[in-house]
Amino acid sequence: MKRKTLTQYLVEQQRSAQALAPEVRLLIEVVARACKAISHAVGKGALGGVLGSLESENVQGEVQKKLDVLSNEILLEANEWGGHLAAMASEEMETIHRIPNRYPKGEYLLLFDPLDGSSNIDVNVSIGTIFSVLRAPHHVSGAEVSEADFLQPGRDQVAAGYAVYGPQTMLVLTIGQGVVGFTLDREMGSWVLTHEKISIPADTKEFAINMSNMRHWDAPVKRYIDECLAGKTGPLGKDYNMRWIASMVADVHRILTRGGIFMYPWDAREPGKAGKLRLMYEANPMSFIVEQAGGASINGTQRILDIQPEQLHQRVSVILGSKNEVERVGRYHSESLT
C-alpha cells in the first residue's frame, strides 16, 4: 500500500470539515522544507564545517553553536516571503522578526527553537527543531505586530511540531486532531506518513530527568524520584528505568514512542526563575503534542497550556508524559502546599 506524504495528509485534513486552514497547511509545508535543509546540514557535520561554537551568545546567555545560527537563518529565510505570517519569534533572537514590507503578510505567528539540544551537536546525539503556530490577533492585520501579540496561552496554538535529527529524520505534528509522525525519505526528498494516531500510555516505568541536580529540586519532585528509585518494594510497586539525553526533542520523542515521564523542574540554584525551559518555544508546543497524544503536561501545579505568558522568553518548570505519572507528581505538589 502506498504511503501518504505530508502534503497529502495536510490536504486531506484541510478538506475534512475544514479542520485546517489553507494558509496553515502551506505554512507547515514551508517549515517542513526548512527542517529538511537543517537535517542536511546536521547530517554533514564536520564535512560541512558546521560543528563547534561561535564567540556570540544568544538572548538566553548561552554560547551559540554554529548550527544554532545556521538553523535560525534557514527558518527565517524560508518563512518570511510566503505570505502566511505576520511575524516570527525564535529562542535565538531577543526580539520578534517582523515580515519585511517587501513581502505579503499573513494572519499567523510562528515561534521556534531552531536547534534544541545543541549541546549534543559535537557528540553526534539526536537533536531537533521545535515549532509552534499561533493566530495573530485580528487587530494586527495589516498593522505592526508587537511582542505582546505573541503572548497567548498554549491552548490557543493552531499547530505544533518538531523534527528530530537522529538515525532517521522524523517530523512529528499536531493540528489539534491527534498526533502523527512522518519520516524523511532522503532519496525522494519527501516526508512520508509512518506513524498514525501516536498515543502515550497512561502508565510507565521510565523517567527522564537529570539526576545530578537532585539536591537542588523541591520536595515533591524529590519524593516522586525517591519512590521511582525504591522500585518494586517502594510505594509505586514497580521498577523504573532512568533515561536522560539532554535534548528535549529526543527525550519527548522516546516518550511518544513508548511512554514515560520527562521532568525539568524548578532548580534552587536559580530560585528567581520558574524553570529552565522556554514556555513559548519548548514547553507550549511539546505540551500541545503530548496532550494530543493522550498525555499530560504541568509545571507542578498548573497545566502548561493554561499559563498566560508575560514575556517572550519566559521560562517554566516542565513535567510531561504518561498521564497517571504526571498527575501523581501534580498531587505531590498540591499536598506540599497544604
Swiss-Prot record:
Entry annotated with the keyword Methyltransferase: no
A GO BP entry: fructose 6-phosphate metabolic process
UniProt-annotated location(s): Cytoplasm
Binding-site residues, Mg(2+) 1: E91, D113, L115
Keywords: Carbohydrate metabolism, Cytoplasm, Hydrolase, Magnesium, Metal-binding
Quaternary structure and partners: Homotetramer.
Protein name, per record: Fructose-1,6-bisphosphatase class 1
Gene from which the chain derives: fbp
